[in-house]
Amino acid sequence: MGTFTLHQGQSNLIKSFFRNYYLNAELGLPNDMELREFALQPFGSDTYIRHLSFSSSEELRDYLVNRNLPLHLFYSSARYQLPAARDMEEKAWMGSDLLFDIDADHICKLRSIRFCPVCGNAITSEKCERDNVETLEYVEMTSECIKRGLEEARNLVEILEDDFGLKPKVYFSGNRGFHVQVDCYGDCALLDSDERKEIAEYVMGVGVPSYPGGGENAPGWVGRKNRGINGVTIDGQVTIDVKRLIRIPNSLHGKSGLIVKEVTNLDDFEFNEALSPFTGYTIFLPYISIETEVLSRNIKLNRGVPIKIESSIGIYLHLKNLGEVKAYVR
């Protein structure tokens, strides 16, 4: 048997689900989209298509549906005079929004399994020598871990609002965490990497002393420290980078099939099937036997035994490497 490589979302059926979604999706595009660089990872490719520029949502939709269907879709946090220029200097940077990234898997220890998609055996290496195929990895994302990520987002919002006077927006990343974004103009947009690093370190609590004896309701870090909040777990590199790509709100995450969605009320957020746009049922063929939590549900799969399951779950399982969606059932 020759070497077998499985690209996430390789299936034509999964592509049709994504294409149908983008035909009518109302993407959350910035008002100044003509100043933003757009980028995407198409189906069946490990590389990104970058340096794209669009002047309207209709032009973008036509490109996505008819030319390059995205597995992952982004625009730049930066504004540029020439966003389609291939040389970063030629783009002429005009400022950037302020970004924070919270990955729940950096907060929790998650169960992960590496296995061969042909024989179904658990394998620690990146290749199954018996079947001469690359192994796949599945990482179980639990609702409890997402809740912990949401709590980090809540603490971050408090710091940005109370200590900086900013108005952040929180987005579910579509997979395993949250993005917090501040739309920046004027001086905020022109913050350089060193200044953004200072903000990142501040929200992470770097160098913030303890305040024993202070009340839990005291303002700022005094109250936070006495409530047991020592800092927010963020990926500091995301905040520092003034030319970072952002997942487009209401786009689909190619590793889950879930929507990148603004969370307007943190108390109401739930990690469940409502985050998927897909309806109906699919026939799903598992690669391995496993019991696992999927979008706050416990799912039992038996290797090689097809099951009829909600499309939201089936597509999620497919993109998480646990098997293949074989058919769509209304």
Swiss-Prot record:
Belongs to the eukaryotic-type primase small subunit family. Keywords: DNA replication, DNA-directed RNA polymerase, Magnesium, Manganese, Metal-binding, Nucleotidyltransferase, Primosome, Transcription, Transferase, Zinc. Signal peptide: none annotated. SUPFAM superfamilies: Prim-pol domain (SSF56747). Its cofactor is Mg(2+); Mn(2+). Its EC number is 2.7.7.-. GO terms for biological process: DNA replication, synthesis of primer. Gene3D superfamilies: DNA primase, PRIM domain. Transmembrane segments: none annotated. The lineage of its organism: Archaea, Thermoproteota, Thermoprotei, Sulfolobales, Sulfolobaceae. HAMAP family: DNA_primase_sml_arc. Zn(2+) binds at residues 116, 119, 128, 131. This is DNA primase small subunit PriS.
